[in-house]
Structures are given as C-alpha cells and as structure tokens.
Amino acid sequence: MMLMRESPDDRHYTVSATGVWKKRGGIDVLRGLDMYVRRGERYGIMGTNGAGKSSLINIILGLTPPDRGTVTVFGKDMRRQGHLARARIGVVPQDDCLEQNMTPYENVMLYGRLCRMTASEARKRADQIFEKFSMMDCANRPVRLLSGGMRRLTMVARALVNDPYVIILDEATVGLDAKSRSALWQQIEASNATGATVLVISHLAEDLERMTDRIACICAGTVRAEWETAALLKALGALKILEIDHSVSPRGKELFCNHGLHVHENDGRLSAVHPSSDFALEAVLKKEAVPTTTRFATLDDIIRFPGFPWTGVGGVNGEK
C-alpha cells in the first residue's frame, strides 16, 4: 500500500519542519528538509554520519536557527518562540552534559527545578524513575565516578523528570547493557502511552524497531524516504543480502552487475540486495563456484546501501 507523504496542510503535529536549510562551514548540511511528526507518534530518524541529523535536532531544540525555512514545536516557531516550548521538551543528547561533581539525583532534581517543577514534584518523579532504572544504589555518588552506562541513564532520567510532551533520544542507548536498554524502552513506552511524542535518532536497528511507528531516512540533508515501521520490517523480510569476497571470487562482481543489482563494496567484500524469492542468481553463483553468504535484510542495510531503491519498499511515502 502506497502512503501519502505528510504535508503542511495536515494537522495534529507536534513537530514540523518545512523547507529547512542550514549551512555549516560553507557546506549545506540541510537542503530544504521537510518533516512532520504527528502528536503522540514515535518517529525514528536514521542516516549516515554527516547526513544532517544533529543539525536538525539543534534546530528543533531552538539551539541554532535555520538559514531558511521554519521549524515549529507545539505550533511555536522555535526561532522566535522557542522558550515557550523548551520547558516541555526532554532531550538525551549524544554528548555527556551532566554536572560531573553533582550526583545523579542532584542532576535530575536541578533539571526538574529549571523546568519549574516544585521540589516535591521533582523529588517524587525522580524517585519513580530511579527505581524504574534500578539506579537507587548510585543515586548519591558523584557522576564523575559512574560508568558510562550509568551516566547515560542519568541523562535519560533527567530528560523524563518533567513528564515532557516531546522526548528526543539522540543515540540514547549507547553504552547501555541489555537490562538498562529494556528499562529505557519500557519507560519511553509508558511516556508515549500517556501522549508524549518521541523522536528517536539511532544507528541501532533494535532501537528503531522497538521504539518507532514511522522511520525517516535522512540523506544529504533531506528526508529521502519515510516508512511505517511495521510495513518496512515486513518488506525487509522479503529481501536478502548476498555477500562475496571479491579477492577470492572476482567473477562474483560481474554476476551481480549482470543481474542489475546495486553493489556495495567494503574491505574487499561485495554485498548486494536481492529478492528472497528469487533463487536464479544463487544458482548461477553456485554453478560458478562463487562462495556466497546469504542473510535477510535489516534496517542497517538501508544505510549501507544508499543506492538501492528503498523508496519502493514497504509502502514508502516516496523519494524527494
């Protein structure tokens, strides 16, 4: 089923970006980007390093203005009215921005107070989150003495303390063990169930699969494609990745190209995306004695194979 791309005429957005351009170091890192996130939606953003993800998040937060275009949160233009929206946004940035000489509990309480919560409100909410994340044992130790994973959870707790309407997770699970990652997912799901809109920026397929309803792929500063997550995952199950060692089997590349496949090369290994129902090429590879590894496609492959026409997969909205 083909989906209609979101447009400025549609309503019920929490976050909208229209025609956003941003230049950094003389280079356009955002190039007329359009993105519309519905209220209560869990929206994933994926893309290679340098695709423009961090620049977009900084503009959404009102930390830097766009050169052209408009970004609104709750209908407020973040260039002019960002202060009216920021108090209801919880963000987990990539970089550690905690007060290192304060304890996790003090960091979370401070943020709650900055968001105009009363001390009792902030304390009650902090207790709930620290208990959920099993952090009570380290709640009163200086942040500088904690592991990277515990510091990361402290940043998540800080972002959630004021029950934000928008939660932005920028590689939030980096450094977390499986138990902590699961606790984070559960907490985000609980916040989303009460109406919070969630933006997930991650290079981990597991995060995007678990925490999103829709996924956008940002490439060269624009939203190249969007998918409903469930439809995309189902469609990926109908694709497979064929991999060969080019140094061992130079003939394999010729066979890939003869079948019109988009080929990705990395450290001498060639990979190509292929329909899982088509066994003709594999039969040829076997006949030619080309050692081939076969696996199902994953979300990671959308980044690995930018030349593949992913816009035809999973009811995608369409390529810009």
Curated annotation (Swiss-Prot):
Query: Which SUPFAM superfamilies does the record cross-reference, listed alphabetically?
Result: P-loop containing nucleoside triphosphate hydrolases
Q: Which SMART domains match?
A: AAA (SM00382)
Indicate where this protein resides in the cell: Cell inner membrane
The UniProt subunit note reads as follows: The complex is composed of two ATP-binding proteins (NodI) and two transmembrane proteins (NodJ).
Quote the function comment for this protein.
Part of the ABC transporter complex NodIJ involved in the export of the nodulation factors (Nod factors), the bacterial signal molecules that induce symbiosis and subsequent nodulation induction. Nod factors are LCO (lipo-chitin oligosaccharide), a modified beta-1,4-linked N-acetylglucosamine oligosaccharide. This subunit is responsible for energy coupling to the transport system.
Protein name stated in the entry:
Nod factor export ATP-binding protein I
Q: Where is the ABC transporter domain?
A: 15-245
Instruction: Please give the chief subcellular localization of this protein.
Output: membrane
Q: Which GO terms describe its cellular component?
A: plasma membrane
Q: Which residues bind ATP?
A: G47, T48, N49, G50, A51, G52, K53, S54
Origin organism is: Azorhizobium caulinodans (strain ATCC 43989 / DSM 5975 / JCM 20966 / LMG 6465 / NBRC 14845 / NCIMB 13405 / ORS 571)
**Recorded E.C. number(s)?**
7.6.2.-
Entries under InterPro entries matching the protein: AAA+_ATPase, ABC_transporter-like_ATP-bd, ABC_transporter_ATP-binding, P-loop_NTPase
One Pfam family in the UniProt entry: ABC_tran
Family the UniProt entry places it in: Belongs to the ABC transporter superfamily. Lipooligosaccharide exporter (TC 3.A.1.102) family.
Q: Which GO molecular-function terms appear in the entry?
A: ATP binding; ATP hydrolysis activity
Bilayer topology annotation: Peripheral membrane protein
Which key words tag this protein in UniProt?
ATP-binding, Cell inner membrane, Cell membrane, Membrane, Nodulation, Nucleotide-binding, Translocase, Transport
- Does the record's keyword annotation contain DNA damage? no
